[in-house]
């Protein structure tokens, strides 16, 4: 997403193309296709509609929250939502959580706060004026306005999205995940097309073919990362998978920002990365 800013790509159009290539990759790699009648009869069909909508809904929430509450607050709200699928693993799915793993999850939350919240705040991101107009109302309030409602919605929205993914995985049974994931991204694509059409009709943006280039890489990466997460759900409990996954994403993002974008890591970031390693070890230890 940082590359979208560097090359001045339209966020909504690049996001739409991301869903085009994510869905396309899934359909090209799946082993079999459902007919329309078979698709509607799938036990995961209804949940996949909700999940596809939820993908793009949480994105709009995050862009609006970035405008109103700032990047740091938004990122923290998103990553700390790992608490919800972890609790759902215990309450809804009957998973067991021992003391060592619990301590690991607590350390994981501390690590997330340090890695995401301990960044140098001297640089502010460029925010497009057409981002989530219905939510943000083009109100560029920046870091100073700590609006609590949107970050709270991000927290519950992102956590709910993770739970929806687990529920769809359970409904899928032993079938190949490719077609289901491709269909979820296809639903997100339909909503993305509506958003881009709205921007173009209202004159909020102009059509950019170059946005497709940004969507190619992001879409293929998103599809395969989602495919890996869905298949990991078959091997690991929520209480292990989601904390480790979120720590991994945040750590890789921090290191990528340092290597590619010359971001300065503070001592809090380094401490957070060290704690993250300890947290992963504790969470994955067998009781």
Spans of model-derived segments:
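Membrane-interface interhelical linkers
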Residues: 1-49, 59-68, 119-152, 173, ...
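Hydrophobic/aromatic residues within transmembrane alpha-helices
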Residues: 4, 14, 65, 91-97, ...
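Residues that define the loop-to-transmembrane-helix transition and helix capping
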Residues: 12, 72, 98, 175-179, ...
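Hydrophobic core positions of alpha-helical segments in small-molecule transporters
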Residues: 16-17, 50, 77-80, 100-103, ...
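Alpha-helical transmembrane segments of compact multi-pass small-molecule transporters, enriched
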Residues: 21-25, 77-91, 103-106, 187-191, ...
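Hydrophobic/small/kink-forming positions within alpha-helical transmembrane segments
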Residues: 27, 52, 56-60, 82-87, ...
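Loop-to-transmembrane alpha-helix entry segments
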Residues: 78, 94-114, 118-121, 147, ...
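Selected transmembrane alpha-helices and immediately adjacent juxtamembrane segments
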Residues: 144-170
